[in-house]
C-alpha cells in the first residue's frame, strides 16, 4: 500500500521540489502552505508521515506538531525542516519526538533517507 506523506512548507519552490522527489520515490504526497490547512489535511487524510517547516504562516511548526499529537497523531513520524539557526529549535523538535531535523539547505537524499527510515521504524513498531 502506498504511504502518504503530508508536506507543510510555505515556500512553493521547496514544497514542489520535495513533493516531486517524494512522489518519484513512490509516495503519495499532500501539500499545505500553512499550519491550519496542514491540520485539516492531516485530519481528513491521516498521513503516514509529516514533513514540516518550523516557520510557516498561520501556525508555527512546533505548535502545529503539538496540536497534531493532541489530535491523535502522536505515533505519526514528523520530520522538521527549517532555515532558522535559532538555538533551542532542534531540542524543541526532539522534545516533540521528531523523527528528523534538517536545516535548509538540506541534502535531499539525506531527507529522503530519513523519510524511508522513519516509515520503516513506524511500520515495524505500530
Describe these PLM feature segments.
Residues 9:
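Conserved acidic carboxylate
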Residues 15, 57-58, 71, 86, ...:
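The feature encodes the CheY-like receiver
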Residues 16-24:
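Charged docking surfaces used in two-component/phosphorelay signaling
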Residues 34-37, 60-64:
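Acidic catalytic/metal-coordinating carboxylates
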Residues 45-51, 56:
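Active-site beta3 strand of CheY-like receiver
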Residues 63, 85-102, 113:
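Alpha4 helix (beta4-alpha4-beta5 surface) of REC/receiver domains from two-component response regulators
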Residues 106-116:
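C-terminal output helix
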Amino acid at each position: 500500500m502506498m504511504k502518504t506523506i503530508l508536506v507543510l512548507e510555505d515556500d512553493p519552490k521547496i514544497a514542489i521540489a520535495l513533493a516531486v522527489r517524494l512522489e518519484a520515490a513512490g509516495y503519495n504526497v499532500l501539500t499545505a502552505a500553512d499550519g491550519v490547512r496542514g491540520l485539516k489535511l492531516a485530519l481528513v487524510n491521516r498521513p503516514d508521515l509529516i514533513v514540516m517547516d518550523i516557520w510557516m504562516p498561520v501556525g508555527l511548526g512546533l505548535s502545529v506538531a503539538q496540536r497534531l499529537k493532541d489530535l491523535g497523531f502522536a505515533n505519526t513520524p514528523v520530520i522538521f525542516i527549517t532555515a532558522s539557526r535559532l538555538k533551542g529549535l532542534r531540542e524543541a523538535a526532539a522534545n516533540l519526538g521528531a523523527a528528523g531535523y534538517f536545516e535548509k539547505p538540506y541534502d535531499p537524499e539525506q531527507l529522503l533517507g530519513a523519510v524511508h527510515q522513519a516509515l520503516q521504524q513506524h511500520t515495524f513498531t505500530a
